[in-house]
């Protein structure tokens, strides 16, 4: 007779949800094995059995964040205007980060990565949405990837500055600055590839 499973997929998902909410509300420092277990109605040993460590639990939150991020970017409508679509992706990127800054911070925090068994796939899904949008303007795959990386760096830098409180103005003024910067710099990155 097979041994019954002590911890199932539902508990794994519940622990991930509890840790995600703790990060969203209070930042990564709020995640402890004991507090996550208590909030999920289980024991710390269940967290260790399912995730191995606090760091692996946070890495799972990061991976989940990238999955959510890719899904969010994929909802941006594709129109007949690829430049407008890139701008819309940039605004969606910013909107995702501003809606849940703690979660966003964990996704990109130094040393927090999805884990050994899934090293880059979740980040790549996010990047591929952008690269595919750029490829409509830049047919060469290598150039499209380079431009996409440049655009990602641009929007990530702008969002990081805004989240750090370094972009002056109220919400509307910051949005206008963001859009103006994308409009000024984005086309230059695309033009440098010869299109």
For the regions a language model picked out, list residue spans one by one.
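Amphipathic alpha-helical packing segments from all-alpha helical-bundle domains
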Residues: 114-139, 145-150, 172-187
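Short hydrophobic clusters on alpha-helical segments that form packing/core surfaces
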Residues: 15-23, 65, 69, 93
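N-terminal intrinsically disordered/low-complexity leader segments
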Residues: 1-10, 21, 193-195
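Helix-turn-helix
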Residues: 14, 18, 22-56, 60
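Amphipathic alpha-helical segments used for helix-helix packing
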Residues: 98-115, 160-168
């Amino acid at each position: 007779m097979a041994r019954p499973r002590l911890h199932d997929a539902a508990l794994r998902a519940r622990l991930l949800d509890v840790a995600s909410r703790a990060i969203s509300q209070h930042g990564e420092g709020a995640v402890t094995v004991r507090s996550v277990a208590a909030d999920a109605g289980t024991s710390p040993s269940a967290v260790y059995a399912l995730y191995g460590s606090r760091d692996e639990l946070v890495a799972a939150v990061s991976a989940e964040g990238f999955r959510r991020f890719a899904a969010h970017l994929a909802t941006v409508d594709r129109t007949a205007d690829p430049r407008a679509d890139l701008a819309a992706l940039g605004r969606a990127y910013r909107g995702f980060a501003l809606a849940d800054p703690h979660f966003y911070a964990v996704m990109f925090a130094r040393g927090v990565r999805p884990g050994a068994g899934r090293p880059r796939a979740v980040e790549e899904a996010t990047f591929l949405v952008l690269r595919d949008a750029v490829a409509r303007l830049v047919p060469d795959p290598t150039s499209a990837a380079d431009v996409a990386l440049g655009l990602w760096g641009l929007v990530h830098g702008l969002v990081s500055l805004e989240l750090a409180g370094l972009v002056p103005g109220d919400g509307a003024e910051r949005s206008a600055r963001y859009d103006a910067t994308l409009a000024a710099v984005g086309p230059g990155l695309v033009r440098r590839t010869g299109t």
